[in-house]
Protein backbone atom coordinates (compact mmCIF):
# COMPACT_ATOMS: atom_id res chain seq x y z
CA UNK A 1 0.00 0.00 0.00
CA UNK A 2 1.07 3.62 -0.36
CA UNK A 3 0.64 6.59 1.92
CA UNK A 4 -2.13 9.05 1.23
CA UNK A 5 -0.93 12.49 0.22
CA UNK A 6 -3.34 15.33 0.98
CA UNK A 7 -3.48 18.70 -0.69
CA UNK A 8 -2.95 21.65 1.63
CA UNK A 9 -6.69 22.34 1.91
CA UNK A 10 -7.61 18.69 2.46
CA UNK A 11 -4.91 18.35 5.09
CA UNK A 12 -6.21 21.40 6.91
CA UNK A 13 -9.77 20.05 6.86
CA UNK A 14 -8.61 16.63 8.08
CA UNK A 15 -6.57 18.24 10.85
CA UNK A 16 -9.52 20.37 11.92
CA UNK A 17 -11.76 17.32 12.12
CA UNK A 18 -9.34 15.24 14.12
CA UNK A 19 -8.62 18.12 16.52
CA UNK A 20 -12.32 18.68 17.05
CA UNK A 21 -12.79 14.99 17.77
CA UNK A 22 -9.76 14.90 20.03
CA UNK A 23 -10.29 17.83 22.33
CA UNK A 24 -11.30 20.89 20.32
CA UNK A 25 -7.86 22.47 20.04
CA UNK A 26 -7.05 24.46 16.91
CA UNK A 27 -4.43 23.70 14.27
CA UNK A 28 -2.43 26.66 15.60
CA UNK A 29 -1.74 24.80 18.85
CA UNK A 30 1.82 23.55 19.27
CA UNK A 31 0.47 20.17 20.35
CA UNK A 32 -2.74 18.39 21.14
CA UNK A 33 -3.82 15.40 23.16
CA UNK A 34 -6.17 12.89 21.52
CA UNK A 35 -9.02 12.09 23.91
CA UNK A 36 -11.55 9.30 24.37
CA UNK A 37 -13.09 7.84 22.27
CA UNK A 38 -11.11 9.31 19.39
CA UNK A 39 -12.14 8.46 15.84
CA UNK A 40 -12.46 5.30 13.78
CA UNK A 41 -9.05 6.12 12.29
CA UNK A 42 -7.50 7.18 15.61
CA UNK A 43 -9.21 5.41 18.55
CA UNK A 44 -8.33 6.50 22.08
CA UNK A 45 -8.79 4.70 25.38
CA UNK A 46 -10.59 6.13 28.39
CA UNK A 47 -8.80 6.32 31.74
CA UNK A 48 -10.82 3.34 32.93
CA UNK A 49 -9.97 1.29 29.84
CA UNK A 50 -6.30 2.23 30.07
CA UNK A 51 -6.15 0.87 33.60
CA UNK A 52 -5.50 -2.66 32.39
CA UNK A 53 -2.65 -1.69 30.07
CA UNK A 54 0.28 -1.66 32.48
CA UNK A 55 3.53 -3.65 32.63
CA UNK A 56 2.11 -5.65 35.51
CA UNK A 57 -0.76 -6.91 33.35
CA UNK A 58 1.44 -7.55 30.32
CA UNK A 59 3.89 -9.59 32.39
CA UNK A 60 1.38 -11.35 34.64
CA UNK A 61 1.45 -14.70 32.83
CA UNK A 62 4.00 -16.99 31.24
CA UNK A 63 3.94 -20.55 29.99
CA UNK A 64 1.42 -21.84 27.47
CA UNK A 65 -1.59 -19.87 26.29
CA UNK A 66 -3.84 -22.84 27.06
CA UNK A 67 -2.38 -23.26 30.56
CA UNK A 68 -0.99 -19.87 31.61
CA UNK A 69 1.24 -19.65 34.65
CA UNK A 70 0.58 -16.65 36.90
CA UNK A 71 4.24 -16.02 37.69
CA UNK A 72 4.01 -12.23 37.74
CA UNK A 73 7.38 -11.47 36.16
CA UNK A 74 8.77 -8.19 37.53
CA UNK A 75 11.95 -7.14 35.70
CA UNK A 76 14.61 -5.49 37.84
CA UNK A 77 17.42 -3.21 36.61
CA UNK A 78 20.36 -5.00 34.98
CA UNK A 79 23.17 -4.30 37.44
CA UNK A 80 26.65 -5.05 36.11
CA UNK A 81 28.53 -2.65 38.38
CA UNK A 82 29.79 -5.40 40.68
CA UNK A 83 30.15 -8.15 38.11
CA UNK A 84 33.46 -9.88 37.53
CA UNK A 85 32.89 -11.44 34.13
CA UNK A 86 34.63 -14.72 33.40
CA UNK A 87 34.30 -13.97 29.69
CA UNK A 88 35.62 -10.72 28.27
CA UNK A 89 35.54 -9.91 24.56
CA UNK A 90 37.94 -7.36 23.11
CA UNK A 91 39.67 -6.42 19.85
CA UNK A 92 42.89 -8.12 21.07
CA UNK A 93 43.09 -11.19 23.28
CA UNK A 94 44.99 -10.60 26.50
CA UNK A 95 44.58 -6.83 26.35
CA UNK A 96 42.40 -5.28 29.08
CA UNK A 97 41.52 -8.75 30.27
CA UNK A 98 40.06 -9.95 26.96
CA UNK A 99 39.63 -13.73 26.89
CA UNK A 100 38.10 -13.79 23.40
CA UNK A 101 38.07 -11.66 20.27
CA UNK A 102 34.71 -12.98 19.04
CA UNK A 103 31.40 -12.64 20.88
CA UNK A 104 30.22 -15.96 19.46
CA UNK A 105 33.36 -17.67 20.75
CA UNK A 106 32.66 -16.31 24.23
CA UNK A 107 29.02 -17.40 24.05
CA UNK A 108 30.06 -20.91 22.97
CA UNK A 109 32.55 -21.17 25.83
CA UNK A 110 30.03 -19.92 28.37
CA UNK A 111 27.41 -22.43 27.25
CA UNK A 112 29.82 -25.35 27.34
CA UNK A 113 31.20 -24.49 30.76
CA UNK A 114 27.98 -23.40 32.46
CA UNK A 115 25.18 -25.86 31.65
CA UNK A 116 23.09 -24.89 34.71
CA UNK A 117 20.78 -21.97 35.39
CA UNK A 118 23.23 -19.60 37.07
CA UNK A 119 23.44 -16.32 35.17
CA UNK A 120 26.55 -15.89 33.03
CA UNK A 121 27.98 -12.45 32.21
CA UNK A 122 29.95 -11.63 29.07
CA UNK A 123 31.71 -8.27 29.07
CA UNK A 124 32.28 -6.53 25.74
CA UNK A 125 35.14 -4.04 25.61
CA UNK A 126 34.73 -0.95 23.40
CA UNK A 127 35.06 -1.77 19.71
CA UNK A 128 33.15 -2.93 16.65
CA UNK A 129 32.53 -6.67 16.40
CA UNK A 130 31.67 -7.83 12.90
CA UNK A 131 29.62 -11.00 12.71
CA UNK A 132 26.47 -12.65 13.97
CA UNK A 133 25.74 -13.69 17.54
CA UNK A 134 23.43 -16.69 18.04
CA UNK A 135 22.24 -17.87 21.46
CA UNK A 136 20.46 -21.25 21.31
CA UNK A 137 17.39 -22.50 23.11
CA UNK A 138 18.15 -23.88 26.56
CA UNK A 139 21.14 -21.63 27.20
CA UNK A 140 21.69 -20.53 30.80
CA UNK A 141 20.57 -17.00 31.68
CA UNK A 142 23.00 -14.82 29.74
CA UNK A 143 23.89 -11.13 30.00
CA UNK A 144 25.94 -9.39 27.31
CA UNK A 145 27.00 -5.92 28.43
CA UNK A 146 29.14 -3.20 26.95
CA UNK A 147 32.01 -1.86 29.05
CA UNK A 148 32.01 1.59 27.45
CA UNK A 149 30.55 4.79 28.85
CA UNK A 150 27.90 4.83 26.12
CA UNK A 151 26.17 2.14 24.04
CA UNK A 152 27.72 3.64 20.88
CA UNK A 153 31.14 2.43 22.02
CA UNK A 154 30.32 -1.27 21.68
CA UNK A 155 28.89 -2.21 18.29
CA UNK A 156 27.83 -5.60 16.94
CA UNK A 157 27.46 -5.29 13.17
CA UNK A 158 26.90 -7.22 9.95
CA UNK A 159 24.98 -6.60 6.72
CA UNK A 160 22.31 -9.25 6.19
CA UNK A 161 19.40 -9.06 3.75
CA UNK A 162 16.32 -11.27 3.72
CA UNK A 163 16.63 -11.30 -0.07
CA UNK A 164 20.13 -12.80 -0.12
CA UNK A 165 20.60 -16.43 -1.17
CA UNK A 166 21.59 -19.21 1.26
CA UNK A 167 24.96 -19.34 -0.52
CA UNK A 168 25.53 -15.63 0.09
CA UNK A 169 24.41 -16.10 3.68
CA UNK A 170 26.98 -18.85 4.20
CA UNK A 171 29.72 -16.68 2.72
CA UNK A 172 28.73 -13.70 4.85
CA UNK A 173 28.06 -15.41 8.18
CA UNK A 174 30.53 -18.30 8.21
CA UNK A 175 33.44 -17.40 5.89
CA UNK A 176 36.11 -18.85 8.17
CA UNK A 177 34.16 -21.68 9.77
CA UNK A 178 33.13 -19.75 12.86
CA UNK A 179 30.17 -22.11 13.22
CA UNK A 180 30.97 -25.82 13.47
CA UNK A 181 28.65 -28.86 13.93
CA UNK A 182 29.72 -29.30 17.57
CA UNK A 183 28.87 -25.70 18.48
CA UNK A 184 25.80 -25.00 20.66
CA UNK A 185 24.27 -22.66 18.06
CA UNK A 186 25.18 -24.76 15.01
CA UNK A 187 21.57 -25.80 14.45
CA UNK A 188 20.51 -22.14 14.22
CA UNK A 189 23.14 -21.35 11.62
CA UNK A 190 22.56 -24.60 9.71
CA UNK A 191 18.80 -24.06 9.47
CA UNK A 192 19.46 -20.86 7.55
CA UNK A 193 22.52 -22.04 5.61
CA UNK A 194 20.63 -25.02 4.17
CA UNK A 195 17.37 -23.31 3.28
CA UNK A 196 15.92 -24.74 0.09
CA UNK A 197 14.43 -21.49 -1.20
CA UNK A 198 16.02 -18.77 -3.28
CA UNK A 199 16.32 -16.40 -0.31
CA UNK A 200 16.90 -16.71 3.42
CA UNK A 201 13.81 -14.63 4.29
CA UNK A 202 13.23 -12.47 7.36
CA UNK A 203 13.69 -15.29 9.87
CA UNK A 204 17.38 -15.66 9.00
CA UNK A 205 18.29 -12.00 8.54
CA UNK A 206 19.15 -11.16 12.18
CA UNK A 207 22.61 -10.01 13.24
CA UNK A 208 21.93 -11.04 16.84
CA UNK A 209 19.43 -13.82 17.53
CA UNK A 210 18.53 -15.40 20.85
CA UNK A 211 16.15 -18.31 21.36
CA UNK A 212 16.89 -18.54 25.08
CA UNK A 213 14.93 -17.44 28.12
CA UNK A 214 16.28 -14.80 30.52
CA UNK A 215 18.49 -13.20 27.87
CA UNK A 216 19.78 -9.70 28.68
CA UNK A 217 21.55 -6.94 26.76
CA UNK A 218 22.92 -3.74 28.27
CA UNK A 219 24.87 -0.72 27.07
CA UNK A 220 25.63 -1.73 23.49
CA UNK A 221 24.56 -1.24 19.88
CA UNK A 222 23.38 -3.86 17.40
CA UNK A 223 23.26 -2.72 13.78
CA UNK A 224 22.29 -4.50 10.61
CA UNK A 225 24.73 -2.67 8.35
CA UNK A 226 22.63 -3.19 5.22
CA UNK A 227 21.09 0.22 5.98
CA UNK A 228 20.99 2.46 2.88
CA UNK A 229 23.09 0.20 0.63
CA UNK A 230 19.88 -1.15 -0.92
CA UNK A 231 16.91 0.44 -2.64
CA UNK A 232 13.57 1.31 -1.05
CA UNK A 233 12.02 -2.06 -1.91
CA UNK A 234 11.57 -5.11 0.31
CA UNK A 235 14.80 -5.75 2.21
CA UNK A 236 14.08 -7.05 5.69
CA UNK A 237 17.26 -6.61 7.71
CA UNK A 238 16.84 -7.55 11.36
CA UNK A 239 19.32 -6.16 13.89
CA UNK A 240 18.03 -8.11 16.90
CA UNK A 241 15.67 -11.06 17.10
CA UNK A 242 14.52 -12.59 20.39
CA UNK A 243 12.30 -15.64 20.80
CA UNK A 244 12.68 -16.45 24.49
CA UNK A 245 10.75 -15.46 27.60
CA UNK A 246 11.78 -12.81 30.15
CA UNK A 247 14.09 -10.94 27.75
CA UNK A 248 15.52 -7.61 28.93
CA UNK A 249 17.19 -4.78 27.03
CA UNK A 250 18.56 -1.76 28.86
CA UNK A 251 20.39 1.21 27.34
CA UNK A 252 20.60 -0.55 23.98
CA UNK A 253 20.62 0.89 20.45
CA UNK A 254 19.10 -1.12 17.59
CA UNK A 255 19.75 0.22 14.09
CA UNK A 256 18.49 -0.90 10.71
CA UNK A 257 15.83 0.09 8.22
CA UNK A 258 13.13 -2.54 7.55
CA UNK A 259 12.36 -4.94 10.45
CA UNK A 260 14.97 -3.68 12.91
CA UNK A 261 13.69 -5.49 16.03
CA UNK A 262 11.95 -8.86 15.71
CA UNK A 263 10.54 -9.51 19.18
CA UNK A 264 9.00 -12.86 18.55
CA UNK A 265 7.87 -16.33 19.56
CA UNK A 266 9.19 -19.35 17.67
CA UNK A 267 10.44 -22.88 18.24
CA UNK A 268 13.84 -24.52 17.94
CA UNK A 269 13.15 -25.27 14.26
CA UNK A 270 12.79 -21.54 13.51
CA UNK A 271 9.04 -21.86 12.91
CA UNK A 272 6.38 -19.44 14.09
CA UNK A 273 4.37 -20.86 16.98
CA UNK A 274 1.10 -19.81 18.57
CA UNK A 275 1.07 -21.71 21.85
CA UNK A 276 3.14 -19.87 24.46
CA UNK A 277 4.15 -16.53 25.90
CA UNK A 278 7.42 -14.75 25.19
CA UNK A 279 7.82 -11.60 27.28
CA UNK A 280 10.31 -8.78 26.78
CA UNK A 281 11.09 -5.55 28.60
CA UNK A 282 12.96 -2.82 26.74
CA UNK A 283 14.02 0.23 28.76
CA UNK A 284 16.00 3.43 28.16
CA UNK A 285 16.83 2.42 24.60
CA UNK A 286 16.82 3.70 21.01
CA UNK A 287 15.37 1.91 17.98
CA UNK A 288 15.75 3.21 14.42
CA UNK A 289 14.23 2.13 11.12
CA UNK A 290 11.71 2.83 8.40
CA UNK A 291 9.28 -0.05 7.72
CA UNK A 292 7.71 -2.29 10.40
CA UNK A 293 10.83 -1.81 12.45
CA UNK A 294 9.39 -3.17 15.70
CA UNK A 295 7.41 -6.31 14.96
CA UNK A 296 6.51 -9.78 16.15
CA UNK A 297 4.30 -11.88 18.40
CA UNK A 298 5.92 -11.43 21.81
CA UNK A 299 4.36 -9.63 24.75
CA UNK A 300 6.67 -6.63 24.98
CA UNK A 301 6.82 -3.47 27.08
CA UNK A 302 8.86 -0.50 25.84
CA UNK A 303 9.62 1.95 28.65
CA UNK A 304 11.41 5.25 27.97
CA UNK A 305 12.35 4.19 24.47
CA UNK A 306 12.91 6.50 21.51
CA UNK A 307 11.59 5.17 18.21
CA UNK A 308 13.17 7.12 15.36
CA UNK A 309 11.85 6.86 11.80
CA UNK A 310 14.34 7.68 9.04
CA UNK A 311 13.85 8.62 5.39
CA UNK A 312 17.38 7.98 4.11
CA UNK A 313 16.50 4.79 2.17
CA UNK A 314 13.74 6.59 0.31
CA UNK A 315 10.98 4.23 1.40
CA UNK A 316 7.55 5.38 0.23
CA UNK A 317 5.97 3.98 3.39
CA UNK A 318 7.00 4.18 7.02
CA UNK A 319 5.58 2.19 9.94
CA UNK A 320 7.01 1.87 13.42
CA UNK A 321 5.09 -1.11 14.83
CA UNK A 322 3.70 -4.30 13.28
CA UNK A 323 2.50 -6.68 16.03
CA UNK A 324 0.96 -10.04 15.12
CA UNK A 325 -0.62 -10.92 18.45
CA UNK A 326 -2.81 -14.02 18.69
CA UNK A 327 -6.49 -12.91 18.79
CA UNK A 328 -7.17 -14.75 22.05
CA UNK A 329 -4.22 -13.03 23.78
CA UNK A 330 -5.08 -9.68 25.33
CA UNK A 331 -1.59 -8.20 25.43
CA UNK A 332 0.89 -7.56 22.63
CA UNK A 333 3.00 -4.38 22.70
CA UNK A 334 2.87 -1.62 25.32
CA UNK A 335 4.73 1.67 24.80
CA UNK A 336 5.01 3.92 27.85
CA UNK A 337 6.91 7.11 28.71
CA UNK A 338 8.46 7.06 25.25
CA UNK A 339 9.11 9.24 22.20
CA UNK A 340 8.24 8.66 18.57
CA UNK A 341 10.31 10.91 16.34
CA UNK A 342 11.40 11.27 12.72
CA UNK A 343 14.34 12.68 10.80
CA UNK A 344 14.27 15.81 8.64
CA UNK A 345 12.67 13.89 5.80
CA UNK A 346 9.59 13.21 7.93
CA UNK A 347 9.50 15.86 10.64
CA UNK A 348 6.68 18.29 9.92
CA UNK A 349 5.39 16.23 7.00
CA UNK A 350 2.92 14.14 9.04
CA UNK A 351 3.16 11.18 6.66
CA UNK A 352 4.78 8.33 8.61
CA UNK A 353 2.50 5.84 10.36
CA UNK A 354 2.63 4.76 13.97
CA UNK A 355 2.13 1.21 12.80
CA UNK A 356 -0.16 -1.44 11.42
CA UNK A 357 -1.33 -4.91 12.32
CA UNK A 358 0.59 -7.81 10.83
CA UNK A 359 -1.92 -10.39 9.61
CA UNK A 360 0.81 -13.00 9.55
CA UNK A 361 0.09 -16.16 7.56
CA UNK A 362 -3.12 -14.89 5.95
CA UNK A 363 -1.91 -13.96 2.48
CA UNK A 364 -4.00 -16.63 0.78
CA UNK A 365 -7.08 -16.54 3.01
CA UNK A 366 -7.30 -12.89 3.93
CA UNK A 367 -8.12 -11.86 7.48
CA UNK A 368 -10.24 -14.49 9.24
CA UNK A 369 -11.75 -13.06 12.46
CA UNK A 370 -10.76 -15.15 15.44
CA UNK A 371 -8.18 -17.17 13.49
CA UNK A 372 -5.79 -14.67 11.93
CA UNK A 373 -3.41 -12.72 14.15
CA UNK A 374 -4.85 -9.38 15.26
CA UNK A 375 -1.99 -7.23 16.49
CA UNK A 376 -2.42 -5.58 19.90
CA UNK A 377 -0.64 -2.35 20.84
CA UNK A 378 -1.14 0.55 23.23
CA UNK A 379 0.90 3.75 23.09
CA UNK A 380 0.38 5.66 26.32
CA UNK A 381 1.93 8.51 28.28
CA UNK A 382 4.23 9.25 25.34
CA UNK A 383 5.11 12.00 22.87
CA UNK A 384 4.61 11.76 19.11
CA UNK A 385 6.32 14.36 16.93
CA UNK A 386 5.12 15.95 13.69
CA UNK A 387 6.50 13.15 11.51
CA UNK A 388 3.36 11.07 11.92
CA UNK A 389 0.04 11.16 10.11
CA UNK A 390 -2.37 13.17 12.23
CA UNK A 391 -5.74 11.97 10.96
CA UNK A 392 -4.79 8.42 9.96
CA UNK A 393 -1.82 7.29 12.05
CA UNK A 394 -2.48 3.57 11.54
CA UNK A 395 -1.99 1.81 8.21
CA UNK A 396 -3.75 -1.09 6.54
CA UNK A 397 -2.56 -4.47 7.80
CA UNK A 398 0.61 -6.02 6.46
CA UNK A 399 0.12 -9.25 4.45
CA UNK A 400 -3.64 -8.80 3.84
CA UNK A 401 -3.97 -5.03 3.35
CA UNK A 402 -6.98 -5.15 5.70
CA UNK A 403 -8.13 -1.53 6.17
CA UNK A 404 -7.65 -0.14 9.64
CA UNK A 405 -10.88 0.01 11.64
CA UNK A 406 -10.93 1.35 15.18
CA UNK A 407 -13.74 0.61 17.61
CA UNK A 408 -15.33 3.74 19.10
CA UNK A 409 -18.57 2.16 20.30
CA UNK A 410 -19.65 3.36 23.79
CA UNK A 411 -19.86 -0.28 24.93
CA UNK A 412 -16.85 -1.50 23.04
CA UNK A 413 -14.95 -4.72 23.60
CA UNK A 414 -11.26 -3.86 23.34
CA UNK A 415 -10.54 -7.33 21.95
CA UNK A 416 -13.36 -7.47 19.40
CA UNK A 417 -11.98 -9.57 16.54
CA UNK A 418 -13.85 -7.45 13.99
CA UNK A 419 -11.80 -4.36 14.81
CA UNK A 420 -8.14 -3.48 15.08
CA UNK A 421 -6.50 -3.40 18.52
CA UNK A 422 -4.14 -0.44 18.07
CA UNK A 423 -4.77 2.27 20.67
CA UNK A 424 -3.51 5.46 22.25
CA UNK A 425 -3.91 6.93 25.70
CA UNK A 426 -2.56 10.20 27.11
CA UNK A 427 -0.29 10.88 24.15
CA UNK A 428 1.00 14.34 23.34
CA UNK A 429 1.11 14.99 19.59
CA UNK A 430 3.32 17.77 18.26
CA UNK A 431 1.80 19.66 15.34
CA UNK A 432 4.95 21.55 14.41
CA UNK A 433 8.44 22.03 15.83
Curated annotation (Swiss-Prot):
Which residue stretches, if any, does this entry annotate as coiled coil?
none
* Residues that bind substrate: 202, 236, 356, 358
Q: Which GO terms describe its biological process?
A: cell wall modification; pectin catabolic process; pectin metabolic process
- List the EC numbers from the record: 3.1.1.11
Q: Which InterPro entries match?
A: Pectin_lyas_fold, Pectin_lyase_fold/virulence, Pectinest_B, Pectinesterase_Asp_AS, Pectinesterase_cat
Class of this enzyme: hydrolase
Q: Which pathway does this chain act in?
A: Glycan metabolism; pectin degradation; 2-dehydro-3-deoxy-D-gluconate from pectin: step 1/5
Predominant subcellular localization, coarse grouping:
membrane
What keywords would UniProt list here?
Aspartyl esterase, Cell outer membrane, Hydrolase, Lipoprotein, Membrane, Palmitate, Signal
State the phenotype upon gene disruption: Decreased growth on methylated oligogalacturides; double pemA-pemB deletions grow very poorly on methylated oligogalacturides.
Query: Which reaction does this enzyme catalyse, per its entry?
Result: [(1->4)-alpha-D-galacturonosyl methyl ester](n) + n H2O = [(1->4)-alpha-D-galacturonosyl](n) + n methanol + n H(+)
GO cellular component term of the entry, any:
cell outer membrane
Read off the Pfam families from this record. Answer: Pectinesterase (PF01095)
**Induction, as annotated:** By polygalacturonates and galacturonate. Repressed by kdgR.
Question: What are the GO MF terms of this UniProt record?
Answer: pectinesterase activity
The pH note for this entry is:
Optimum pH is 7.5.
- Membrane topology, as annotated: Lipid-anchor
The annotated dependence of activity on temperature is:
Optimum temperature is 40 degrees Celsius.
Q: Any ranges marked Periplasmic in the topology annotation, and which?
A: 22-433
Q: Cite the positions of N-palmitoyl cysteine lipidation.
A: 22
Q: Which residues form the signal peptide?
A: 1-21
Q: Where in the cell is it found?
A: Cell outer membrane
Q: Which residues form the active site?
A: 259, 292
Briefly, what is this protein's role? Probably involved in the degradation of methylated oligogalacturonides present in the periplasm. More active on methylated oligogalacturides than on pectin.
Family per similarity comment: Belongs to the pectinesterase family.
Q: What is this protein called?
A: Pectinesterase B
Q: Which organism is it from?
A: Dickeya dadantii (strain 3937)
Amino acid sequence: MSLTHYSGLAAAVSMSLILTACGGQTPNSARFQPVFPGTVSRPVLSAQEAGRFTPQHYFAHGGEYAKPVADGWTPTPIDTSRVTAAYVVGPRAGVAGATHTSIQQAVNAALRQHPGQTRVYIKLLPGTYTGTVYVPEGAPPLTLFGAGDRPEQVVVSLALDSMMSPADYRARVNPHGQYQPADPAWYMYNACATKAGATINTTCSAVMWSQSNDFQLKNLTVVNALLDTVDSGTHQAVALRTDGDRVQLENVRLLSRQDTFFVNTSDRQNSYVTDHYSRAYIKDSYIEGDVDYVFGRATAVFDRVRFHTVSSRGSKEAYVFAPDSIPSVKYGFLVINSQLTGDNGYRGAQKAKLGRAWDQGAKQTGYLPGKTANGQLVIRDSTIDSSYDLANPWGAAATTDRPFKGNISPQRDLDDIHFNRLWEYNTQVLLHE
